[in-house]
Each structure stands twice: as C-alpha cells, then as structure tokens.
Amino acid sequence: MIVDRYYYHQLNKKEQAIYKAFYNGVMAYQEIIPIPVSGEFTHNSFEHIFMALTRDNPLIYFLNQSACSIAHDIFGHIAICPQYFFSKEKIKEYSRKIEKVVNELAGKLHLLECSDYEKELRVHDWICQNVAYDYEGTDKDKVSRVIASHNILGVFAYHKAQCEGIAKAVKVLLNAVDVKCIVVTGTAGKDGNMGPHAWNIVNIDGEPYHLDATWDISLPESMRITYDYFNLTDDLMNLEHNPENVLPKCNKGSANYFIKNRCDFQTRYTLLKYIQAQIEHGKKELLFLSLIHISEPTRLRRI
C-alpha cells in the first residue's frame, strides 16, 4: 500500500500543518482538534483543506463537512470541531469491514501479480461489473443513502454509488496495490449539460491518465464493460470534463485501452480492414477508437 497525497502537496506550509493536525485528529475521533494557526482562519480556508484531506484519504468516509465548525477562544486559539456520521464504534466496525473487502478483492483479482496497467484494468472491470450508479444518491429524504453513495461505503458495502463514491473506491483499491491515483472533481456533461462530477487520474508506468469508471458503467441490462474513458489524454477528456483543480498533465496515449489493444484507427482503410477481419472471425460486437475525418474524436463505435 502506498500513501498517495497529491492535494497535500498543493497546499502551502501553513495549510499542510493544519491538514496534518486535522488528519491526526479525525483518525483519533477527536471532537475538538486544535490546529497550529494563529490569526484569521476562514471557512473558505477550512473547505479548501477539507477537500484536500478527503480526496487524498477516501478511507476518511465518516466526516460531515456541512456540520463541521471552527471554534475560537479569547486567547486566539483555533480548533476544528468535526461532526462524524457514525459513532466511534461504528466507524471502527465499518473500517474493519472495508479493509477486509479491499484485501479480499486484491486477492480475488490477483492484483499483486500483474502490471500497473493490468491492475487498473481489473479494478475498472470489477467496478463496471459489480457497481451500479445510484440514481437516488441525491435524494434528501434518504440521508443514509446519500452519505453512502458519496463515499466508499456505497461501493464496498452496497455496490451502488455516485461518481464521488466510485472515484474514491478506485483510489482506495489502486493505492492498496501501490498504484498512484488521484480523485478529480469538477464538472462534466454532454451537449452543454454540465454538472458536478468526479473521476480519477491514474499513474501508469510513470505517466498520468484520466480514468472515468462511472461513465464506463453500462445500464444493468446490457452487462457490457465499456472503455470509452479508460486512460484518456487531456485533449480527449476535456471535451466533456472540466476539472476544478490544477492537475498533472495527461499528454501520453500509450496506455489508452484502444491504443494498447491496437484498435485505434486514423484512416478509413485500416478501420474497414479491421472490421472485416473481426466479422470473419465471428465477432458480433466491436469496440474501437476512431479518429477519422472528424473535428472531435469519437471514442466508441459499436457494430
């Protein structure tokens, strides 16, 4: 397992000190966490550090951001007063169960016996085959459902989550087998209909790539695994995704699923030749990347 804290390293020294104190405090389930800062500490600063902490550490799934507060005393001391979704005993119980599930998956998928690319592929495929998108995960009348859906509990306990929970689970699984992975937040959408979204940047053979497992999840009845958003470059990803933070540049394409499997095509001749050969071999469904005579790449064509 690796400790992979990308957002911590984007903070200044003062923010990093607060991040560390906050992390140590919540891992000890403290109700009042003194922080090493004097002077002004705004709610915006707190939110910035909170987001860095929870994206770097998806195993901190039990914090209620909207209910956390900042306390000041007459001597100028400042403390964070966190609110936890669950009791200390429940958090320990859930954390043990999550650790067990992650370890069992690492063994079942043989994640310690393969390349980083193969680890990512197997985690992606497991998510796509075993996790459904939770369309009720924003229903305010179902508070426990919302809590689970937006963190790793949704994936590991209920096999149903929204994009944030899925992206965090991907990071937990990949970090557990020594693959660097970032949770990315921003907006995404098609045809101009943008909304909040979360996905990942995964480091494969020293190069970062975008991975959106949520958008690769098919409808339950199709039972397909798709690879539309498996290891994309910035140019491809930014057609429909807008990250809100400064991120590593994703400029290499060699670990893209279609390029890796030699089913990416830039001429009509090579594409038609590929289709003909696959049909002759009895294939009824083809997945490929086409970059032919179009201004915006078409990631997937099914035949």
Please give the residue ranges for each predicted region:
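Linear, non-domain "peripheral" regions
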Residues: 1-104, 299
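Short glycine-rich, basic-tinged beta-strand/loop micro-motifs
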Residues: 25-39, 276-291
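Secondary-structure boundary elements
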Residues: 87-155
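Conserved structured core elements
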Residues: 117, 146, 160-164, 168, ...
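Gram-positive cell-envelope targeting signals
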Residues: 123, 158, 163-165, 169, ...
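Hydrophobic/aromatic-rich core segments of domains that either
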Residues: 165-235
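Charged, amphipathic alpha-helical linkers/stalks
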Residues: 241-275, 279
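Single conserved hydrophobic/aromatic residue that forms the stacking wall/gate
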Residues: 292-303
